[in-house]
């Protein structure tokens, strides 16, 4: 048994105590199950219904979960989940790409995300990220440490952008690093830039002296992703 499954089983026990027969499915997803042992374990739980008393019960366990390196689970009513696939295509698409069933049925069986919903969400996410980088750079006043912090803290979001562009273009496979690199290739982003950002995604530290070197290429990479989405035709 994979080590993270023990923590997932404990979470299922906690949720079963709270929701009893209303608990329908639990899946694990995210960096931890893809090999990043330093990341907290993230899970999605689907239930028949969720009320204030359920939230109170979960809140009592928040500290316990944190101590055991469990992220607060994403808990949704099953029908709410089905109706929100078009509203959160990127978030659900990332779970769909790589997840493992822990309890109940796999909620992603026979689920598909419309490409146009994905394209629209990609455009919003990429252009918002581009504005964030430009504004952040101006706010830094050109100070290397501030630029380094901007690059490091935004690295996970950049990795997500690359994976979403790969998915938009039919990128198969569940391997996180391979899909991320595929997104970079589609946008013509140099492998070295993608490698640097992948490193930061897992270990958000960067020598201050490297910030000025990396930021211009990073900004150009996000601009390239925006062009890919603008010209996408399915």
Q: Could you describe each region identified by the protein language model?
A:
Residues 24-32:
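Short gly/ser-rich loop at a beta-strand->alpha-helix junction or flexible surface loop bordering the NTP-binding
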Residues 3, 61-148:
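Conserved NTP/Mg2+-binding pocket subregion across the NTase superfamily
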Residues 13-22, 48-55, 80-87, 114-119, ...:
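Short, mixed-charge, low-aromatic patches
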């Amino acid at each position: 048994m994979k080590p993270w499954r023990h923590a997932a089983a404990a979470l299922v026990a906690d949720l079963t105590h709270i929701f009893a027969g209303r608990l329908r499915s639990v899946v694990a997803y995210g960096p931890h199950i893809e090999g990043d042992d330093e990341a907290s374990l993230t899970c999605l739980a689907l239930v028949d219904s969720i009320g204030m008393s359920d939230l109170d019960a979960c809140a009592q366990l928040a500290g316990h979960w944190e101590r055991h390196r469990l992220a607060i689970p994403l808990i949704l009513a099953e029908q709410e989940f089905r109706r929100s696939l078009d509203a959160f295509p990127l978030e659900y698409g990332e779970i769909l790409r790589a997840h493992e069933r822990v309890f109940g049925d796999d909620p992603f069986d026979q689920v598909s995300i419309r490409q146009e919903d994905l394209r629209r969400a990609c455009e919003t996410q990429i252009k918002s990220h581009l504005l964030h980088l430009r504004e952040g750079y101006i706010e830094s006043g050109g100070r290397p440490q501030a630029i380094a912090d901007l690059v490091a803290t935004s690295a996970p979001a950049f990795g997500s952008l690359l994976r979403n562009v790969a998915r938009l273009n039919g990128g198969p496979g569940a391997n996180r690093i391979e899909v991320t690199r595929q997104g970079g290739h589609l946008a013509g982003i140099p492998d070295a830039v993608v490698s640097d950002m992948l490193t930061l995604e897992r270990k958000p530290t960067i020598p201050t002296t490297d910030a000025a070197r990396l930021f211009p290429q990073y900004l150009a990479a996000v601009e390239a992703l925006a062009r890919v989405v603008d010209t996408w035709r399915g």
